[in-house]
Amino acid sequence: MYIRTALLTAGFLPLGHGLPRPQITYEENTGPVGGVDPPFPTFTAAVGDLRGSTDLQGGIASRPPTSGGDSAIVPDPELVNGQDADADLGLYLDFNSATAPNGPQPIRGGLGGTDPGPRTFEYEKLNPDLYAPPGTDTGDVPNAMWPLGLSHNRHGTGQEAGWARQQNTEVLPAATAMAGVDMRLSPHAYRELHWHTSAEWALVLKGSVRVAAINEDGASFVDDVTAGDVWFFPSGIPHSLQALDEGAEFLLVFDDGNFSEDETFLASEMLLRSPKEVWAKDLETDVSALDNIPQDQKYIFNGTPAPSDIEKQNTTGSAGSLSGPDGYTYHWSQQEFHNTTGGSVKILDPLTFPIAEMFSAALVVLEPGALREVHWHTTSDEWSYFLQGSARITIFKAPESSRTFDFTAGDVGYIPQAQGHYVENTGTEDVIFLEVLQAKKFGDISASQWLALTPRQVVKDTLGFTDDVLDKLPKDKTLIKPGNTNLTALAGGSS
C-alpha cells in the first residue's frame, strides 16, 4: 500500500490509466529508488489512499535495519583514465567510455565518492568537470555556461518560416553586459522590420542574408552577407533581415544582458498602436490604405524572394547611401586567419569596423589538445559562443575561487571583467569559438607574457619558479599554446 500511495501522490502513476510508454530512452539509473521499485503494475481504476497512516510517524513506525537493508553501494565502480591521478593535476576526464550502471562516477584523485542515485548519464558525460571537478576548483563562482539547446524556441508566424532562441540574464544571471540570440530564417523568410534599444552585433553561421537599414540622416544601406560575415546596428537603427535562396542561421549579440527578443519594436505593432487617422496623415495617404495592415505582429515570416540584383533594392534619398566606415556590414569571411602553432585566430574590432564602436571580437580555432592561453580582459566582460567541438574553461575569481565548466557546440560562455581564464580543447576535432568584448580594441593580458616581462627576481621570490622555467617564457603574446592530444598522458593514460 505504501509504494502504491507514494506513486500516486508523486504523480508517477496516472489515476485510472496504465503507465505511458516512454517517448525517449536515456541512459539513466535503474532499479529501486526513493522507496519505489519499478516496474510497477498498471491499474484500470483508482486504488488506495493518497495519505498514509499516522502510525508511520517517527518513533512509532518500525525502523529499517542498520545492515542488510536498502543499499546505496555501487558495486565495482568504473573509473576512466585520469580519475586515479592527483586531483590537482586536473586532467580532463572523458566519461564517454564509462558505461551504466557502474559509471561515470564523481571521483577524482581519491576524493568524492560513487553516485547510486537518480541521474541521467548524458549530463555527466557533457559536464565531467562539474561532476568530478579538478582539485584546484574551490569556492563559489557563478554559473558561466548556458546551452542554447535548453532555451525556449520561439517559432515564426509563417509556415516553417524560422525560429529564434535566446540567452539573457533570465537563464544566465551573471551575463549582465551582453545577451545572445540564435536565429534561423528559412529561404526568403524575413525578420520583420524592427529596432531595439540595444546595439546588435551579428555573425552569420550558415547561409546568406540581405540586410537593410537607414540612419538618422536618412542615408540608406543594403548589403548581402554570408557565413562568416558580420553586421552591426547601433541602438535605435531600424533594419530588416531577409534570408536569400539557401536560408540562413545567425548569431546576434546585444550590449545588454537583459535584452529580450520578445520586446523589440516591430513595424506591424507600431502601425497598430496609433490611430489610423494619425497614420494616414503621417504617410500622406487615405485612411483606407490602412485597411490591409497586419492585425498582429509578423515577427518571422515567409516572403517574396529577393532579387539577385541587389541594386534593385538600393533605394536612396537626398542623403544618399552608406558604405565603407559608415556601412553596417563587414565581410569577415574574406579575412585570412593569423595562424600559429596549435591553432588560428582572427580579430574584428573598431580599428577595422568602426561603426561597431564598442564591439570587439576574436574567432578562434584550437587544434586538439591546444590551449587558448591563460588571460583576462582589463575593461570588459567576455561573451563566448562555441561553434564546433568540445572545450573546458576554468574561471579564477578573486580572491581564491575557481570553477571549471565544459562546453560543446551551441553553448554560451560568460566571464566577468578581469577574471582569469583559459580555453582548452578537450576533444578530437578542432574547437571553433567566438570571443566578444565590449571594447574599442580587442586585447587581453597574457599570464605567461606578464611573468616573462616582470623582473625575474620578483617572479622567483613570489612564485618560486626556477631560471629554467623563466627562460622558456615567451616575451611576446602567443594567444594559443599547443598541447598533447592525449589529455591523460601525465597519468600514464591512453588517448
How would you label these PLM feature ranges?
Residues A175, L185, N215-G236, L366, ...:
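Short acidic-glycine-tyrosine-enriched beta hairpin
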Residues G247-P307, D430-T485:
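Active-site-adjacent segment of 2-oxoglutarate/Fe(II) JmjC oxygenases
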